[in-house]
A protein has these predicted regions:
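Nucleic-acid substrate recognition interfaces
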Residues: 2-206
């Protein structure tokens, strides 16, 4: 075993580097959270909400992705119910995403939506079933077509960028935005929301 001696100052800097960085990717990830025993736990994520002011074309793209996500969610939920009724089994999110890939061959309009958002809709179906079987919520229900308020989540964190009064989102490009100051950090995902009054928002999870 090799023993390395270093000054107290250098030792402190090494500890701080280990706590605040991802040693595999060598990227800054922010402070970690520790439990009562001093052991590291999952880092707390925080969401920041922005008001979006999309153009007419961007609104059409958002609404199209919302409709596609609702369609995929309802379709996968229907398949889940039929499979569970017949065999007492359920599909994983991975299996549903494979079905989604085949669906795009005969439903080409799905290709015009955010692909990551459609995959996330499959994950939402799986999570809804898991929460139901754990008795954490009721049985999953279908999303209504005429529902005014709706949202979809995209997980393309590397494609999401924020600048002063602007946010760049997958498939939409730069959109004018207003809201509080968002600190620099790794963006995990963004949820695009359309309110019942027709306003658009983005919740950025970091």
């Amino acid at each position: 075993m090799k023993i390395i001696f270093m000054s107290p100052k250098k030792a402190c800097l090494s500890i701080l580097y280990a706590l605040f960085t991802n040693t595999r990717k060598n990227e800054w990830i922010g402070p970690r959270v520790f439990d009562v025993w001093g052991l590291p736990t999952k880092r707390i994520l925080k969401a920041y909400k922005l008001r979006l002011y999309p153009t007419v074309e961007q609104q059409a793209r958002i609404d199209h992705t919302l409709d596609c996500c609702r369609f995929v969610f309802n379709h996968m939920l229907d398949r889940q119910q039929k499979i569970y009724t017949r065999r007492g089994e359920h599909m994983s999110a991975y299996d549903m995403q494979k079905v989604l890939t085949r669906m795009k061959n005969y439903l080409p309009w799905l290709r015009d939506a955010d692909s990551k958002a459609l995959k996330y809709a499959c994950c939402q179906v799986e999570d809804a079933y898991k929460h139901f079987f754990k008795k954490q919520c009721g049985f999953p229900h279908f999303k209504k077509k005429r529902q005014c308020a709706a949202s979809y989540t995209t997980t393309k964190g590397t494609s999401i960028h924020i600048e002063q009064r602007q946010v760049k989102l997958p498939l939409l490009g730069w959109i004018e935005a207003r809201g509080g100051k968002i600190p620099d950090g790794v963006i995990k995902r963004a949820t695009i929301q359309r309110s019942a009054t027709g306003k658009y928002y983005a919740s950025i999870l970091m």
